[in-house]
C-alpha cells in the first residue's frame, strides 16, 4: 500500500511540473538581474553551455561554490557559463541581500562567475525560468 501511495505522489508531482512548465521558451529567452542589479540576459550566452545552479550561503552544500569556481575557471574559455541563482525558498538558507551574497561569495570562495540576484524558485512568485 505504501508503495502505491509513493508512486501516486511521484506521478502527481511530475504532472504538476508538466502542467506549470513553460515549453514555449528556450533558456536564452529568459532574463535575471545580477547581484549588482544589472540585467543579465541569457541570450548573451547563446551557443554556449550554461550550467544553472540554485545556491544558498547557509546551505549544507555551500562548499559547492569552490567546485563551481574551479569548473568555471577550467572551462569558461571553452564556452561554458556557470550561473549561480541564489534562492531563499529552501529552509531560509539564503537570508542575505544581493550585496551580502556577493561579499560572501567573493570573500569566502573567490567567485568570479555570474550570479543572479536572489529569486524565488517555487510557488506562485517563482522566477519563470
Describe the function of each predicted region.
Residues 1-8:
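Bacterial N-terminal signal peptides that target proteins for export
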Residues 8-17:
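Bacterial N-terminal signal peptides
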Residues 20-43, 128:
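N-terminal "domain-start" segment that seeds a small globular fold
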Residues 26, 31, 99-129:
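Short, internal strand/loop/helix patches
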Residues 36-38, 65-70, 99:
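Alpha-helical scaffolding within the catalytic cores
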Residues 48-50, 58, 62-88, 106-109:
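Conserved helix-turn-beta segment immediately C-terminal to the redox Cys motif
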Residues 57-59, 88-92, 120-123:
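Solvent-exposed loop/turn segments at secondary-structure junctions
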Amino acid at each position: 500500500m505504501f508503495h502505491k501511495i509513493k508512486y501516486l505522489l511521484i506521478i502527481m508531482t511530475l504532472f504538476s511540473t508538466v502542467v506549470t512548465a513553460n515549453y514555449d521558451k528556450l533558456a536564452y529567452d529568459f532574463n535575471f538581474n545580477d547581484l549588482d542589479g544589472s540585467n543579465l540576459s541569457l541570450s548573451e550566452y547563446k551557443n554556449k553551455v550554461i550550467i544553472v545552479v540554485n545556491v544558498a550561503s547557509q546551505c549544507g552544500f555551500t562548499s559547492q561554490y569552490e567546485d563551481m569556481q574551479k569548473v568555471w575557471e577550467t572551462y569558461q574559455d571553452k564556452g561554458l557559463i556557470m550561473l549561480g541563482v541564489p534562492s531563499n525558498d529552501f529552509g531560509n538558507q539564503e537570508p542575505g541581500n544581493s550585496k551580502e551574497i556577493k561579499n560572501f561569495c567573493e570573500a569566502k570562495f573567490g567567485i568570479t562567475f555570474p550570479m543572479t540576484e536572489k529569486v524565488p524558485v517555487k510557488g506562485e512568485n517563482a522566477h519563470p525560468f
